[in-house]
A protein has these predicted regions:
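Short acidic-hydrophobic catalytic motif
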Residues: 1-151
Length: 151
């Protein structure tokens, strides 16, 4: 049953459907929001709100990295520099926000020393399934291309 849910998530092509699928209680959802996001896209705001970042959206558009589950924030870097390790055997995760070589802030979602990033400008999402103990999906929302979903 869980494998069917994972496959349905991977085949979802719009933010509304993906938002619904991410409510699976067996999912940890890692969300990286780059500084390039300005919050003008209403669909993106709804997506992030459903993912658990609604309170953060009230204080202007957030930048940082979050770990959420069922629309609740479990951990977050905040907008400043941070590095947080999260262990869920057999995996080890790191969410971090740091200054890059060009002085701009960069976000990273790392699992077992592999960095996951689909788009350079926008939102990156990594979905970990607690039952299968695998990364089940990863995608980006490219704000430089009309919030197109990139898998």
């Amino acid at each position: 049953r869980e494998m069917i849910a994972d496959q349905e998530l991977k085949e979802s092509g719009d933010m509304e459907t993906i938002s619904e699928k991410l409510q699976n209680p067996n999912y940890w959802v890692f969300i990286s929001v780059d500084d390039s996001c300005n919050g003008e896209d209403q669909e993106l705001q709804r997506f992030l709100g459903a993912a658990g970042l609604g309170d953060a959206l009230q204080n202007g558009f957030p930048a940082g990295v979050w770990l959420t589950s069922q629309g609740k924030i479990l951990n977050a870097t905040g907008a400043g520099t941070a590095k947080i390790y999260i262990r869920k055997k057999p995996k080890e995760f790191c969410i971090q926000r740091m200054a890059g070589a060009d002085g701009q802030m960069e976000n990273q979602i790392i699992c077992d020393r592999v960095s996951y990033r689909k788009v350079d400008s926008g939102v990156n999402v990594v979905v970990y399934d607690l039952m299968t103990e695998e990364i089940e999906d990863q995608f980006g929302i490219d704000v430089s291309d009309g919030c197109r979903i990139v898998r």
